[in-house]
Amino acid sequence: MKTSVLVTVLGLAVISVLCSASQDEEQDMYDELLSAVFEVNDELQSEARCGEKNDRCKTNQDCCSGFRCTKFRRCGRR
């Protein structure tokens, strides 16, 4: 009787630990997914803000990579 109670308690403890570990892994998966989505969103927004050829600019940072701000305040080829 004592042995079966001990085995039952140990079994419940093992199940509890396994369930807790799987919940942590699931939460980590959601956190990684959300951070990846926000990272892609930030990249798209920063790319959308840069100036293409003949877009108005004040500095070279206003133009996309491969372009520079010309003396006419337009993005042009380097």
From Swiss-Prot:
Signal sequence segment: 1-21
Keywords: Disulfide bond, Ion channel impairing toxin, Knottin, Secreted, Signal, Toxin
Keyword Secreted on entry: yes
Chain residues in the propeptide: 22-49
Keyword Transferase attached: no
Subcellular location(s) per record: Secreted
Family in the record: Belongs to the neurotoxin 10 (Hwtx-1) family. 64 (Jztx-20) subfamily.
Protein name in the entry: U23-theraphotoxin-Cg1a 1
Annotated organism of origin: Chilobrachys guangxiensis (Chinese earth tiger tarantula)
